[in-house]
Amino acid sequence: MKTESYIYWCADDFGITAASCDRIAECAANGCLNKISVLPNSDVEDIAGRLKSILDIQKVTFCVHLNFVEGLCVSDKNDIPLLVDCGGSFKNSFTGLLKISLSKNRKALREQLKTEMKAQISRAAAFFPENEPLFIDSHQHTHMIPLIFSVLCEVIEE
């Protein structure tokens, strides 16, 4: 049985700035993209409207681009102190998350990641078309950290 292969031309970080949103939308309108990874914790104004305008132009698959290293958290900052500073901004790099995942704080990190992950997925899912598969990846590939991947699998199962 022969299966047809499909290549995704993906733009990451939709929502990192208004200008990048505009550029990504332009690429989608010109048929250069068929997948867009959206930062759920974006503070860009009217991100839902910007995404809808892309859907109106062309069929594009959207992806939740989980972010644990940049910007503000989506969940309550008091619930995830290993991830954010007192202002709610993420405070760890990829390496920092890896170090914590191997430390005595591993169990607490697992619970805090789960809290933030659920909040980000819930927020982003509201932007996307209903009854469509939900694709998930992560900013700076943090889902490749074994603990984060494990939490992601757990959240998906739930």
Task: Describe each region flagged by the PLM.
Residues 17-25, 116-123:
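Short, acidic/polar
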Residues 6-8, 33-37, 59-65, 133-137:
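Structural preference for beta-strand elements that scaffold enzyme active sites
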Residues 18-45:
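A short alpha/beta connector and helix-capping loop motif
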Residues 73-106:
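Active-site gating loops and adjacent loop-to-helix segments of metal-dependent hydrolytic enzymes
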Residues 12-14, 39-41, 65-69, 139-141:
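Active-site beta-loop-alpha junctions enriched in small/polar residues
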Residues 24-30, 47-63, 82-88, 125-129, ...:
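Acidic (Asp/Glu)-rich catalytic clusters
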Residues 2-18, 24:
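Boundary/entry segment of secreted carbohydrate-active catalytic domains
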Residues 110, 118-158:
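Catalytic domains of cell-wall/extracellular-matrix polysaccharide-remodeling enzymes
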